[in-house]
Amino acid sequence: MKWFIPGSVPSSKNGRRWTGKYFIASKAVMNYRKKAKDYYAKYHDEFKAELAKHDLPAKISFEFIRGTRHKFDYINPAQTVQDDMVKFGWIEDDNAEFILPVFEQYIYDKENPGVWIEILNNEKENNNN
């Protein structure tokens, strides 16, 4: 089963702003999160039900559909998505105990950017002693 979160996924690391007391997310990240939150809420129960069928760490695939041809590092937008997965209760934490991220080759689609999220079978699920 796959879940699609629409929108051009920005990096939560780049563009952070200093308020004088702490860093806040960039406007791009704030706008993305505002638009994506309903999708995370909508798919929450479905994702959790599927996740319950897998041992931890869950092997989770991310396939980014980029709205521009700008170069990017997979880990930066993945961090945004993983932070949202924690925030909206999809996963308990995004550390190595809970998630093993896997990246698919990105796709360019100016009209339909977003990210496909899929829980994969972990070959080691039956070998954890």
Locate the predicted segments by residue.
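Acidic, proline/glycine-enriched N-terminal capping motif
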Residues: 1-129
